[in-house]
Amino acid sequence: MEIKVKTLTEKQIDIEIELTDTIERIKERIEEKEGIPPVHQRIVYTGKQLADDLTAKHYNLERGSVLHLVLALRGGCC
């Protein structure tokens, strides 16, 4: 099924997934399209950050669901 991923710049990416896909696999698909490594991605759906080891089914993702991609930036120390 197809879901949508929105970036902070409001760019929308269409991603084909299966309900059995983990969030980590979805991040890999985003990397294939956008070149952003999964380690730098945070995925938010209905206001919650999604855990890499859980599946699309666990989060009740449906065709047309919109996920939000947030970049995980490392903070520096003083």
From Swiss-Prot:
Q: In which tissues is it expressed?
A: Detected in stems and flower buds, but not in leaves, mature flowers and seedlings.
Residues joined by cross-link Glycyl lysine isopeptide (Gly-Lys) (interchain with K-? in acceptor proteins): 76
Q: Spell out the Pfam families in the cross-references.
A: ubiquitin
**InterPro entries linked to this entry:** Nedd8-like (IPR038738), Ubiquitin-like_dom (IPR000626), Ubiquitin-like_domsf (IPR029071), Ubiquitin_CS (IPR019954), Ubiquitin_dom (IPR019956), Ubiquitin_ubiquitin-like (IPR050158)
Q: Which residues form the propeptide?
A: 77-78
A molecular function GO annotation: mRNA binding
The answer, when asked if Transport is one of the entry's keywords, is no
SMART domains reported in the protein's UniProt record: UBQ (SM00213)
Q: Does the keyword Protease apply?
A: no
Coiled coil regions, renumbered to chain: none
List keywords of the entry alphabetically. Isopeptide bond, Ubl conjugation pathway
Biological role stated in the UniProt entry: May function as a stable post-translational protein modifier.
Descriptive protein name: NEDD8-like protein RUB3
